[in-house]
């Protein structure tokens, strides 16, 4: 038997008013409204939220505000990101800016007019302490650099991440607001040069190389390995761990053509074997679409960064035209004046440039 809570009479049809059972007669005599969400009648003042007529309880429990933009949402359609309720737009934005898992690369997009001759940068940055959300700082730096970059977790870093660009042609890559990004990272206690692990790696599209020019470039890096370690700000132990030499030396009476063929054959076999351990060379050739130069240490110094990129690009370009493998003047032809001054300050390639006093 069910009785009306207001008149006490037995009722066959159950109505819920303010959480209590009432008969039809009492319901009709009472000012009320039907909540669109819980389906119950209420005598209290109704509320209109997002075109829904709702009770006080549903107003408080069935709606949330997006933590990022403040938009009011139904709880059942809001997306939970960690401990925050988000609208779909803000959720997708956070996904876009968050630090991706290792090898969770997005679909590549090529930036710039030259779609064949492209470059990519991988810059590792780290923090001395773990305070703060890495995704927050990832969002900050990616909002500066734009859609042509993303961040990724790297196991060699303690509290940082790797900044990776999509393929860019030379002009598009250098046009990115690197200086502003470096200032942001430095302001938030990120470091790159002042660490033992951070590197600056550059990828060059394979379309820029012939079999011969790739062998030539590899010989240049090997022949000048100790000098380039200095230019790259690496210690010998760090270079040996992350960007080691192949130790190609000319045999007695070996001509340039002969050593080029010997190196090219070795690199062919290396790419064919595709062993993970072989990627840790100064010139990494095992990737299908790019050649990776791994020797540079990471940096958040804008001038050092530009000098490093200019050096790598210039050597890759000159590998097509060099006629004497041991003539560093040919190899270094076309460097920007700022890069030459940086080389002098590092006391590198003194056979080509007169060095002068300086530091980093």
Q: Can you describe what each PLM-predicted range is?
A:
Residues 11, 30, 42, 62, ...:
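Cys/His-rich microdomains that often coordinate metals
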Residues 160-162, 193-209, 290-294:
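Histidine-centered divalent-metal-coordination microenvironment in nucleic-acid enzymes
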């Amino acid at each position: 038997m069910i009785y009306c809570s207001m008149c006490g009479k037995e009722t066959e049809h159950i109505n819920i008013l303010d959480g209590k059972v009432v008969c039809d007669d009492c319901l009709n005599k009472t000012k009320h409204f039907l909540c669109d969400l819980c389906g119950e009648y209420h005598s209290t003042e109704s509320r209109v939220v997002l075109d829904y007529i709702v009770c006080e309880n549903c107003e408080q429990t069935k709606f949330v505000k997006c933590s990022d933009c403040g938009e009011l949402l139904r709880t059942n359609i809001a997306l939970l990101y960690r401990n925050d309720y988000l609208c779909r737009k803000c959720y997708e934005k956070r996904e876009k800016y968050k630090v991706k898992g290792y090898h969770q690369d997005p679909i590549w997009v090529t930036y710039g007019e030259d779609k064949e001759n492209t470059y990519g940068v991988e810059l590792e940055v780290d923090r001395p302490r773990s305070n703060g959300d890495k995704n927050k700082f990832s969002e900050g730096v990616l909002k500066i650099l734009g859609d042509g970059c993303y961040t990724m977790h790297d196991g060699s870093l303690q509290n940082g991440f790797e900044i990776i660009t999509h393929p860019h042609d030379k002009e598009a890559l250098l046009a990115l607001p690197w200086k502003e990004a470096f200032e942001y990272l430095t302001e938030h206690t990120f470091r790159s040069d002042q660490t033992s692990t951070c590197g600056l790696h550059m990828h060059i599209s394979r379309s820029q190389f012939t079999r011969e020019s790739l062998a030539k470039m590899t010989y240049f890096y090997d022949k000048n390995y100790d000098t380039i370690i200095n230019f790259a700000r690496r210690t010998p132990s760090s270079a040996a761990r992350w960007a080691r030499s192949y130790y190609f030396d000319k045999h007695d009476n070996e001509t340039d053509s002969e050593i080029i063929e010997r190196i090219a054959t070795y690199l062919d076999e290396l790419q064919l074997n595709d062993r993970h351990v072989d990627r840790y060379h100064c010139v990494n050739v095992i990737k299908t679409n790019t050649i990776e130069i791994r020797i540079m240490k990471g940096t958040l110094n804008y001038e050092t960064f530009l000098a490093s990129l200019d050096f790598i690009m210039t050597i890759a370009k000159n590998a097509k035209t060099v006629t004497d493998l041991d003539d560093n003047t040919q190899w270094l032809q076309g460097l920007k004046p700022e890069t030459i001054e940086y080389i002098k300050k590092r006391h590198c390639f003194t056979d080509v440039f007169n060095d002068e006093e300086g530091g980093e």
